[in-house]
């Protein structure tokens, strides 16, 4: 059993919960997810089965799209509503749509981001959330991220009693982006505390929300002996790579890891190629400027 399940992760489940449940349903241990979603976040979570676990890094490298909401006027320990409130600054009046749009624009493009203390980023061999739970502080490394777009839906809703303003947004960003930190940063741009209120992942690994299946769907497909209706081919993770179809002779060479010239593959030295045989993506080959040949980068199947 090999392929990618574009799973819809429900709120309340961890990403590992989904992996564990699928291992039980599918009766296989070779299951891996392609990017953690917090328990309070729902949406697209591609899960790799069998030999498809080899493409996890390629799925994770793709950009993500999220829809959610940010609440201005308070802050929590975790930067979302799961944490304890550590600051309140009631708003006397709502920010205008132009003000929040300008704040979002300042966070668009290639920027530096510091991951939250309640995250799985490791520092000196320990996860940041382990330091946080122990009441310890540690210097957090910044990372470079790209926010392709940060669209806000107007000025949102103002709660005069609570002194808060909640604004819906949609974000397209690179891997490794903490959206709850972007919510906090939006507040900083406006000079007020902020927290991410809700979040749904709309796209990941090339899969959209409309393409996902639920755990119940997978269980039903397994019971009907039709699991293939929930599986997508490995090639979904490799759609951005140039593809070259191999004949029987070239496949015999490739499956044994033989280096190939650009002429043999009829290529003008593309940096990396996805090689297919009989309609199935078998491997990735990478061009070596030093050797002037294509060399194996990752094998997915040899039969």
Curated annotation (Swiss-Prot):
GO annotation (BP), single: mRNA pseudouridine synthesis
**Keyword terms:** Isomerase, tRNA processing
Q: What EC number(s) is this enzyme filed under? A: 5.4.99.25
**Which residues does UniProt mark as catalytic?**
38 (nucleophile)
SUPFAM superfamilies in the cross-refs: Pseudouridine synthase (SSF55120)
Q: Which reaction does it catalyse?
A: uridine(55) in tRNA = pseudouridine(55) in tRNA
Give the record's family classification: Belongs to the pseudouridine synthase TruB family. Type 1 subfamily.
* Protein name according to UniProt: tRNA pseudouridine synthase B
Q: Which organism is it from?
A: Levilactobacillus brevis (strain ATCC 367 / BCRC 12310 / CIP 105137 / JCM 1170 / LMG 11437 / NCIMB 947 / NCTC 947)
């Amino acid at each position: 059993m090999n392929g990618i399940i574009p799973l819809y992760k429900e709120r309340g489940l961890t990403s590992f919960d989904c992996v564990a449940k699928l291992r039980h349903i599918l009766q296989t241990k070779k299951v891996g997810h392609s990017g953690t979603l917090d328990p309070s976040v729902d949406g697209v979570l591609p899960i790799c089965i069998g030999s498809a676990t080899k493409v996890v890094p390629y799925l994770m490298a793709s950009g993500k799209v999220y829809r959610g909401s940010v609440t201005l006027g308070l802050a929590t320990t975790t930067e979302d509503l799961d944490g304890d409130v550590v600051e309140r600054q009631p708003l006397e009046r709502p920010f205008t749509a132009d003000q929040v749009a300008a704040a979002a624009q300042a966070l668009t493009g290639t920027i530096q981001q510091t991951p939250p203390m309640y995250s799985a980023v490791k520092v000196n061999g320990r996860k940041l959330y382990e330091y946080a739970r122990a009441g310890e502080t540690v210097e957090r490394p910044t990372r470079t991220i790209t926010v392709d777009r940060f669209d806000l839906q107007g000025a949102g809703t103002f709660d005069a009693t609570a002194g808060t303003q909640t604004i819906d947004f949609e974000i397209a960003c690179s891997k490794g982006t903490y959206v709850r930190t972007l919510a906090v940063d939006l507040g900083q741009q406006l000079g007020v505390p902020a927290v991410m209120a809700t979040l749904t992942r709309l796209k990941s690994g090339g899969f959209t929300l409309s393409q996902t299946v639920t755990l119940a769907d997978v269980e039903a497909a397994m019971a009907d002996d039709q699991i293939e209706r929930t599986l997508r081919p490995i090639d979904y993770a490799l759609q951005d790579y140039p593809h070259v179809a191999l004949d029987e002779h070239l496949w015999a060479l490739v499956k044994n890891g033989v280096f190939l010239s650009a002429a043999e593959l009829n290529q003008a030295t593309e940096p990396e190629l996805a090689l297919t045989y009989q309609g199935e993506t078998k491997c990735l080959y990478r061009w070596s400027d030093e050797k002037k040949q294509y060399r194996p980068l990752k094998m997915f199947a040899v039969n």
